[in-house]
Regions:
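Acidic, low-complexity intrinsically disordered regions
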Residues: 1-179
């Protein structure tokens, strides 16, 4: 079974993009339902904490993501989010694609370091055929992804705007289809 784990930044800097992000997530899920109806999806929202909106759900069973489900606030704990998600999945025999979308940079992780995450990513890509996608709006997006061991071909710099977020999810869709 293949699964997509969508890690969605819900830090305070995303406040002005709430409606656009919700719509883009719904469009992404609808497209995935058409392309990969048997896949499962987990949607993990993160700031300095993580919340699992959908967990290991079949795409066909996922309800509409609503504005009330996405309330941005707080800081951005990218390493802790990746670490927690990897820890949750790594003992399953599931082929996972982790797709992370952030408008900022790491500023709140307490449990995991970039070095620990990089080591895990390399192990999972080599031994379990996991894939990692990193979409970021920060000017250091490619460097941030490289530090984590995520390849340039699976990394993109996006624009955190009403126009940029839908484009980012469309790009994510293509990246997932190509791996």
């Amino acid at each position: 079974m293949k699964e997509i784990a969508l890690l969605l930044d819900k830090s305070g800097s995303m406040i002005g993009l709430q409606k656009t992000t919700v719509k883009a997530v719904n469009n992404f899920i609808c497209e995935q339902k058409l392309i990969h109806p048997k896949k499962r999806l987990s949607l993990i929202q993160f700031n300095e904490k993580r919340s699992w909106t959908y967990e290991h759900q079949k795409l066909k069973d996922i309800p509409t993501f609503e504005n009330k489900d996405y309330q941005p606030s707080g800081l951005t704990a990218i390493y802790d989010t990746l670490g927690d998600v990897i820890k949750k999945y790594e003992n399953n025999n599931t082929e996972v694609t982790i797709a992370l979308l952030t408008d900022g940079y790491e500023n709140a992780s307490r449990k995991f370091t970039a070095k620990k995450i990089r080591k895990k990513i390399k192990q999972l890509e080599k031994h379990k055929k996991w894939k990692f996608i990193y979409l970021g709006a920060d000017s250091s997006t490619f460097l941030d992804a490289e530090i984590l061991g995520i390849s340039k071909q699976n990394t993109a710099q996006i624009e955190a705007s009403e126009e940029g977020i839908p484009i980012a999810f469309s790009l994510m869709q293509k990246m997932i289809s190509n791996i």
